[in-house]
């Protein structure tokens, strides 16, 4: 960790993968001060139809034209906010996913290039 609160490190490339382009993974450490994680209102969409996602009655919409990757989740279950609160994970979920991915790579001995990791304040 540096004097500004940035945490960074790397997982070295496995043997024979040293020339592969490094992969960078980044997440922020802080949480949104405007939302305290109470009164979280998730919206669970079973069998997503591949169209725009209306976030409850908030007037907010996740439009497929703005988020074209949504179409790839057609038929799956989506969990979103109802538009009035954060889901409570903020980027703590991002940190957990990055650390889990690195742990999995180390445990399973999956061949990989250098993995660069950074967590920002």
Show the residue positions of the predicted features.
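A non-catalytic alpha/beta surface segment that caps or lines the substrate-entry region
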Residues: 1-20, 30
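Beta-rich nucleic-acid/ligand-interaction surfaces
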Residues: 6-11, 114-115, 119-121
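Active-site metal-coordination/substrate-binding segment of hydrolases
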Residues: 18-109, 114, 119
